[in-house]
Amino acid sequence: LFPYTTLFRSIRLRVGRPLFYTYDGGEGFLTDHDGKYVVTREDLKETMEYISGYSLYSYEDEMRQGFLTVQGGHRVGVTGKVILDGNEIQGMKYISCINVRLAHEVVGCADQVMPYIRKKDWVAHTLIVSPPRGGKTTLLRDIIRQLSNGEEKKKMPGVTVGVVDERSELAGSYQGVPQNDLGMRTDVLDGCPKAEGMEMLIRSMSPAVVAVDELGRKEDFKAVESVIHSGCKVIATAHGNSIEDVIHQPYFEKLVR
């Protein structure tokens, strides 16, 4: 593993199967003297106890969503037996898989697109479109950082950015504090539904820009319209193979025309 430790992207543990990892440029399995190391249920139990600081109960709310975020902004997804109360998810037991996605920022990845988004005191409404795992969130994170910090050499002051981080992927917050660098003028609502969060930010935080990841629900688009009508700029992402693919979806068409 040594050559890849600084390049890890994810580590996946499945009960009864080899420990699997991905890194920049490839993937592999953990091996021992008998071959591929096979993960046991005890491995998963010990891993969950360790990453939760031996206080898994404190992550109950996050576990209902199938993941938790730990210090450093690393995201731990879990699968297993879902506990339901009617139609509501109450938690999870008999965990069978843990997927540790290691946080990584690409500072400067938005350099080439910033001239299209920011010109002196002007910020453009922006929609970033790509297929899953195409880098939307990474790009959005750096756009937020650059807008928030501003650029002194170009005499572009920073602006107040409000972020609704519904799934804790942009800021990677741990106990409410962003672990990723989103800039000095950025306020984050962590774990809040996008539609409700956008309304909250407009009412209470006076942002110049509101940023959200992965628009999709009808309620999201209504909230985006409210943000635009308030005079704020919106920067968001959406799943799609192309802009043409997205604008023909029901709620996007009205938004981007």
Where are these regions (language model features)?
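P-loop NTPase switch/communication element
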Residues: 148-199
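Conserved catalytic network of the ASCE P-loop NTPase/AAA+ motor domain
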Residues: 119-121, 131-132, 149-156, 178-181, ...
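P-loop NTP-binding catalytic core
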Residues: 54-124
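P-loop NTPase nucleotide-binding module
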Residues: 109-166
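Conserved P-loop NTPase nucleotide-binding/switch module
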Residues: 205-257
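Short, small-residue-biased leader/transition segments that mark boundaries at the very start
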Residues: 2-7
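Residue-level signature of catalytic and energy-coupling elements of molecular machines
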Residues: 11, 78, 165
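A charged amphipathic helix-loop-strand protein-protein interaction module that recurs
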Residues: 35-63
